[in-house]
Amino acid sequence: SFDVQIDQESLRGTLNYTNPNYDFLGNSLNYYVTSATNDKPDQGYENTIMGGGISTSFEQYNDVFATLGFSATRDDLKTTGGASDSLKKQSGTFNELAFNYGFALDKRNRSFMPTDGSILSFNQSLPVYADKAFIANTLSSSSYKTLSENVIGAGKMHLTAINGLGADDVR
């Protein structure tokens, strides 16, 4: 898939390719490349973020899926005199290489437009190399229930925490 978002102050693009049955093994293989540029002269900064990654997903046990991957990101932040003190502290170029893994328990009746069931997932990103080391944890949950013939109820929750390691602050 290819996604582009453009507005007056930013340009974002992502190219994502997924092979849902890599080498006929039942594992999915995903590659992505992304770039984002934000030019905010009123707030005193401009930044460019470029990244890419590769991951694989597979059904480890019945309804339990595992995901493993690596991602790399480069963030170049330039500030001017009008930037906040917080942004000025973050000014510079930062690189990271992270190992990502996750698990999902999928009890939906079908993956596309489910009418019953739930999916619960946990994902974590750990630094292999990072100018500012961090750990990112994400917990997501979605629940689906048929309320009537034409109405499906859905409840969703998404929580993410990013914590700096050692004396490093989170950017």
Stretch-by-stretch model annotation:
Residues 111-113, 130, 165:
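Short helix/loop capping segments that flank catalytic or ligand/cofactor-binding pockets
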Residues 47-49, 134-138:
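Amphipathic hydrophobic-ligand
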Residues 1-121, 145, 151:
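Gram-negative/organellar outer-membrane beta-barrel architecture
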Residues 150-171:
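Extracytoplasmic gating/loop element in the C-terminal half of outer-membrane beta-barrel translocons
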Residues 124-126, 159:
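Short, structured patches in soluble enzyme cores that scaffold and shape functional sites
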Residues 17, 141, 157:
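Hydrophobic, well-ordered secondary-structure elements that form the walls
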Residues 138-145:
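Short secondary-structure subsegments characteristic of cysteine-rich extracellular domains
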Residues 37-39, 126-130:
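A generic structural motif
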